[in-house]
């Protein structure tokens, strides 16, 4: 009774307000983890934290509530209106909850020790969960963008590589796979950084071929691996869940295996004979059609693909291709990019 009567009503009001703030913010993040990420593990933690705070939301705090006399009620900051993506909403609400929990921890220390201790424990737990949630959100965003990609430009060494990529991006290409096979690591890093900046400026995905270290160094959207590169589980452990992982395939068995693994997309080919991989026999367009029937993951046909032979792939339902020479070797990379994109976006008859 002494604690009840000695509680400063102003402290009771701010504890009530911050309990509301923390629980509401946790619910905002929880719903994104539930509906946006479909991460049961995160939802369970967030729901548990909400309920633990709810049990500590005593009647004496609620009785002190006075929204009418609260000078901060209804106040907005311009930053609150500048949230245009789920990631920004999650970041803002995690920050909101962390601040509220710190207030509860500090003001509750002398009037409600259990609340203070619980607020501290949840705050530290949220620091880690926020990182996990934002990483998963980045991966979710990248995977959504991947679904919209129809044309992937694979680079090949040439004096005007950056200019050609820039032209392709301006023409609507939304995915670039950088093959960094020549030069020193310092030169490769510099080139990858330039391409990463270009892709960010144009809202395009940048995938680094083979080199996980370079992909991480330039904060690329993902990495593409061949059949003889690191196993998928090892690669995923290195790049984390927030980046894309592609795998080259050359047969239906390899497609089926990649489908079962934690890959985000597949490259399948060579569809036609190609100077890049002359030792590999062409698999033909028909096999691409068969592959599309056994996986829901995006499949990019690759290998000697050009405007001249694109119809054969489209006839079997293929709407995603990866090209090298068709753009990198074209006299007019802008027109080549636009023509390929126009053909790939034609409605199915």
Curated annotation (Swiss-Prot):
2-[(2R,5Z)-2-carboxy-4-methylthiazol-5(2H)-ylidene]ethyl phosphate binds at residue 304. Pfam families: ThiD2, TMP-TENI. The keyword Magnesium applies. Residues 1-125 are annotated as: Unknown. GO terms for cellular component: cytoplasm. Its EC number is 2.5.1.3. Binds 1 Mg(2+) ion per subunit. InterPro entries: Aldolase_TIM, ThiamineP_synth_sf, ThiamineP_synth_TenI, ThiD2, TMP_synthase, TMP_synthase_cyanobac_bac. It comes from the Bacteria. Condenses 4-methyl-5-(beta-hydroxyethyl)thiazole monophosphate (THZ-P) and 2-methyl-4-amino-5-hydroxymethyl pyrimidine pyrophosphate (HMP-PP) to form thiamine monophosphate (TMP). This is Thiamine-phosphate synthase. It comes from Parasynechococcus marenigrum (strain WH8102). The gene is thiE.
């Amino acid at each position: 009774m002494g604690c009840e009567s000695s509680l400063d009503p102003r402290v009771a009001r701010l504890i009530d307000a911050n309990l509301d703030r923390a629980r509401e913010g946790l619910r905002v993040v929880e719903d994104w983890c539930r509906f946006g990420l479909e991460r049961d593990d995160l939802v369970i933690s967030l729901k548990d934290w909400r309920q633990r705070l709810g049990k500590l939301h005593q009647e004496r705090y609620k009785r002190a509530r006075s929204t009418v006399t609260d000078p901060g009620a209804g106040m907005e900051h311009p930053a609150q209106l500048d949230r245009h993506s789920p990631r920004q909403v999650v970041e803002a609400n995690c920050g909101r909850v962390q601040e509220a929990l710190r207030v509860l921890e500090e003001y509750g220390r002398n009037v409600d020790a259990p609340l203070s201790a619980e607020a501290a424990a949840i705050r530290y737990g949220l620091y880690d969960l926020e990182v996990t949630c934002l990483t998963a959100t980045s991966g979710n965003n990248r995977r959504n963008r991947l679904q919209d990609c129809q044309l992937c430009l694979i680079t090949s060494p040439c004096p005007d590589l950056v200019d050609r990529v820039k032209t392709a991006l301006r023409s609507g290409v939304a995915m670039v796979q950088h093959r960094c096979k020549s030069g020193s690591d310092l030169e490769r890093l510099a080139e990858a950084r330039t391409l990463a900046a270009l892709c960010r400026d144009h809202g395009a995905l940048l995938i680094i071929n083979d080199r996980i270290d370079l992909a991480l160094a330039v904060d690329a959207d993902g990495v593409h691996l061949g059949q003889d590169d690191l196993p998928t589980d090892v690669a995923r452990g290195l790049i984390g869940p927030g980046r894309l992982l592609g795998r080259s395939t050359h047969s239906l068995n390899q497609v089926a295996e990649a489908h079962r693994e934690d890959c985000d997309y597949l490259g399948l080919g060579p569809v036609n004979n190609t100077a890049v991989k002359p030792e590999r026999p062409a698999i033909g367009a028909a096999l691409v059609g068969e592959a599309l029937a056994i996986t829901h993951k995006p499949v990019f046909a690759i290998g000697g693909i050009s405007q001249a032979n694109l119809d054969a792939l489209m006839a079997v339902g293929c709407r995603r291709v990866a090209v090298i020479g068709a753009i990198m070797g074209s006299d007019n990379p802008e027109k080549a990019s636009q023509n390929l994109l126009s053909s790939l976006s034609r409605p199915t008859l």
